[in-house]
């Protein structure tokens, strides 16, 4: 039996005698890649399964622009305008303390509307904090196609390679955006521990996301993170001791950086829209990710004007830079502005509260990188300093399947 565990945001420097003594000891005895470098963007799962960098897969961020693929294409314009008006009003109402909890009217409204819209449009993609007038343009990119179907990168797919070895696939504990029956962290842990009773020749894909959640909320070097790392370390100790005859692959797909400053890019977008006489959905759209701003412009001449604006504005050049369009397809934007390390674009289209930690920065930065430890019954200590995330696919098939 093979157990693959994607540990979201398991940063390379978290493996230490202080933070994770069991995992550190494991790294000194078995297969260990100290630093895992993901591709730029937010599509690590497709990189792992396909064995290809994001430039090859075409997956750059989780959400792209293609009106024909949007699940919200039939959403009425009048309803979108009304919802945006209500949303705008509620943003101005301050958060209040009620029954020992913070009541955020805008967040409550968004959650209710999201439930209604996803049900009405049978949508896998959440509406998040995307302006309702723009919602009908966007769709899930990485998770549009089931990663476990034969359509997903047939030749290079890790799934198809495993199946070709007559090993069955188990993805009950895996994750993807829009999954309705996602196991909780504790359910995944119990599920994997109990697998020691199984004699089935299978490859289990599983996911643990607590480090990512805590890293965003409290910061990657917080006390809460230290506590969670200790819990995780104890879990892996228990898991491996109960599955000594299994191969267990522990993969951290990326790191996490403490946010140093927050940058509101919306005033610049409003100015561009007004100065160039642009209209939302007609010749102008934008998407604000946590570490980047993506812009679509219909008119190529006005596109040059926008680029010139970004390159002239001191506030924009001090906080980030326009990156080459070669890194992604047009569905991700005609113009992509990437924030500097430690800068978060806020407000964005995802967060109601300011996070403390963030990822999605330059992938060559040490704190943006993950790690990998592979335990196998007959394993030897192999220590590799760094490797690309896309190579994990090949390593698993060559040495552990």
Where are these regions (language model features)?
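Active-site neighborhoods of enzymes that stabilize oxyanions during catalysis
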Residues: 282-399
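Acidic/histidine-rich catalytic neighborhood
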Residues: 256-294
């Amino acid at each position: 039996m093979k157990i693959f565990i994607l540990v979201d945001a398991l940063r390379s420097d978290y493996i230490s005698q202080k933070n994770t003594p069991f995992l550190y000891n494991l790294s000194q005895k078995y297969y260990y890649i100290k630093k895992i470098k993901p591709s730029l963007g937010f599509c690590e799962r497709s990189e792992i399964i396909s064995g290809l960098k994001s430039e090859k897969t075409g997956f750059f961020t989780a959400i792209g622009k293609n009106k024909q693929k949007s699940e919200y294409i039939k959403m009425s314009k009048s309803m979108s305008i009304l919802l945006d008006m209500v949303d705008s009003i509620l943003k101005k109402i301050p958060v209040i303390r009620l029954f020992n909890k913070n009541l955020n009217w805008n967040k409550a409204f968004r959650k209710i509307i999201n439930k209604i819209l996803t049900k009405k449009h049978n949508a896998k993609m959440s509406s998040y904090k995307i302006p309702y007038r723009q919602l009908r343009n966007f769709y899930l990119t990485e998770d549009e196609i089931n990663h476990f179907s034969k359509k997903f990168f047939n030749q290079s797919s890790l799934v198809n390679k495993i199946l070709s070895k007559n090993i069955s696939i188990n993805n009950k504990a895996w994750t993807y955006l829009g999954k309705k029956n996602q196991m909780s962290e504790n359910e995944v842990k119990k599920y994997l521990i109990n697998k020691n009773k199984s004699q089935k020749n299978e490859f289990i894909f599983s996911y643990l996301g607590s480090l990512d959640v805590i890293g965003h909320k409290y910061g990657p070097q917080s006390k809460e993170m230290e506590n969670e790392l200790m819990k995780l370390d104890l879990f892996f100790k228990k898991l491996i001791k109960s599955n000594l005859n299994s191969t267990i692959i522990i993969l951290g797909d990326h790191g996490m950086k403490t946010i140093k400053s927050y940058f509101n890019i919306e005033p610049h977008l409003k100015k561009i829209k007004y100065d160039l006489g642009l209209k939302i959905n007609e010749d102008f759209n934008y998407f604000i990710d946590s570490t980047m701003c993506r812009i679509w412009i219909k008119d190529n001449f006005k596109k040059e004007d926008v680029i010139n604006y970004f390159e002239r504005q001191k506030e924009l050049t001090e906080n980030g830079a326009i990156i080459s369009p070669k890194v992604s397809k047009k569905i991700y934007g005609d113009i992509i502005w990437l924030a500097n390390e430690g800068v978060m674009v806020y407000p964005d289209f995802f967060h109601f509260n300011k996070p403390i930690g963030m990822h999605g920065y330059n992938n060559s930065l040490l704190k943006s990188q993950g790690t990998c430890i592979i335990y196998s019954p007959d394993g030897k200590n192999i220590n590799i300093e760094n490797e690309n995330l896309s190579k994990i696919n090949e390593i698993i098939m060559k040495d552990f399947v």
